[in-house]
């Protein structure tokens, strides 16, 4: 089939990485996939022109509100994938919730990353019960074997021996919902007591106003660094070399960065929110914190307890291998897309 795939494609964001991986799954099944950024279109009529020009037969959208609403009212069948924003933010706005309800009426299937997301969606839109499937994110990491960690540290203005460093890494697009400043003050205090601990924030500048605020705060914060986005292979190499991966988001659908860190055998410290607690079991596959002070306590414990670190890393790797199989994700999407083929034949 000739498929249209709409997603938010800001480079080096979780959405773009997920969309690229899912496109690969669909193309591996023999489909031709036209991947487009939902933000490039303002109305369904622009999509209608694209469908006609490209002779598209079916469609998929990552995010119901940002992408799915643009697929309504055309003659082609489509499926949708819930993003964290759909359920954590947009569902709280009456008009957006109504729009997403109409999208679900027309969609042939919908995918949620977790059982909790599915449950939330079914409460919000009871009429969609029966067409929502759960498929967690499939994870495959490919760290750049030639990446130079010492050069990265120098570029980050961290002038200490790599042997005795503890780098806590936050990977996120710079926007308020990711809350990268949540831990900055507490961490900076800790760094002044313990100069070999650093926090490095890596990610694209998504929100220009918020980015200025982040840069200003980080510039004044001892032991905290801000690094521009980088390609996936280099980012995986950074994760593999750091001491721990940190997630301080206000809300998440399912953080690929957390799962990638687990796959790379790096301990995870995550803010205790539903999206994170769905994949991190406290003390088993990672550590969950509810405030900056608790984060510092847990980080200090992790630094001083190699046995805990080893246990968390072992369990995290096993969890990802068992529950976030790239192959299972591929099989699921290739099977679901056949629902759109069936509709073409009807």
UniProtKB/Swiss-Prot annotation:
Signal peptide span per the entry?
1-16
* Taxonomic superkingdom: Eukaryota
Keyword line = Glycosyltransferase, Secreted, Signal, Transferase
Quote the InterPro entries the UniProt record gives.
Answer: Glyco_trans_1 (IPR001296), Glycosyltransferase_G1 (IPR052622)
- Listed EC numbers: 2.4.-.-
Enzyme class, UniProt record, top EC level: transferase
Cellular component annotations (GO), alphabetically ordered: cytosol; extracellular region
Localisation:
Secreted
Q: Which Pfam families match?
A: Glycos_transf_1
Which GO molecular function annotations are given, in alphabetical order? glycosyltransferase activity
Write out the similarity annotation.
Belongs to the glycosyltransferase group 1 family. Glycosyltransferase 4 subfamily.
Name of protein: Glycosyltransferase 1 domain-containing protein 1
Q: Which organism is it from?
A: Mus musculus (Mouse)
- What are the top taxonomic ranks of the organism? Eukaryota, Metazoa, Chordata, Craniata, Vertebrata
Gene designation? Glt1d1
């Amino acid at each position: 089939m000739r498929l249209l795939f709409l997603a938010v494609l800001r480079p080096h964001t979780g959405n773009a990485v997920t969309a690229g991986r899912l496109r690969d799954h669909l193309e591996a099944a023999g489909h031709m996939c036209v991947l487009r950024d939902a933000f490039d279109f303002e109305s369904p009529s622009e999509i209608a022109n694209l469908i006609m020009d490209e002779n598209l037969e079916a469609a998929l959208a990552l995010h119901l509100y940002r992408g799915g609403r643009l697929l309504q009212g055309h003659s082609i069948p489509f499926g949708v994938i819930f993003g964290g924003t759909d359920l954590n933010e947009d569902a709280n706005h009456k008009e957006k919730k109504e729009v997403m309800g109409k999208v679900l009426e027309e969609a042939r299937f919908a995918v949620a990353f977790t059982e909790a997301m599915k449950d939330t969606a079914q409460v919000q839109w009871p009429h969609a019960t029966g067409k929502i499937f759960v498929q967690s994110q499939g994870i495959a990491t490919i760290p750049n074997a030639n990446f130079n960690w010492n050069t990265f540290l120098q570029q980050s203005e961290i002038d200490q021996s790599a042997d005795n460093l503890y780098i806590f890494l936050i990977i996120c697009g710079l926007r308020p919902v990711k809350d990268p400043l949540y831990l900055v003050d507490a961490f900076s205090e800790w760094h002044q007591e313990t100069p070999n601990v650093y926090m490095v924030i890596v990610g694209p500048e998504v929100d220009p106003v918020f980015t200025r605020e982040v840069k200003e705060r980080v510039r004044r914060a001892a032991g905290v660094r801000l690094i521009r986005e980088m390609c996936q292979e280099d980012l995986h190499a950074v994760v593999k070399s750091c001491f721990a991966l940190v997630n301080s988001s206000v809300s998440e659908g399912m953080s690929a960065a957390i799962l990638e860190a687990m796959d790379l055998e790096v301990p995870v410290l995550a803010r205790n929110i539903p999206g994170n607690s769905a994949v991190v079991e406290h003390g088993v596959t990672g550590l969950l914190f509810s405030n900056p002070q608790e984060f510092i306590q847990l980080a200090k414990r992790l630094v001083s307890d190699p046995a805990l670190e080893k246990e968390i890393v072992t369990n995290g790797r096993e969890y990802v291998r068992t529950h976030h199989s790239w192959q299972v994700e591929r099989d699921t999407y290739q099977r679901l897309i056949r629902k759109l083929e069936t509709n073409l034949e009807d």
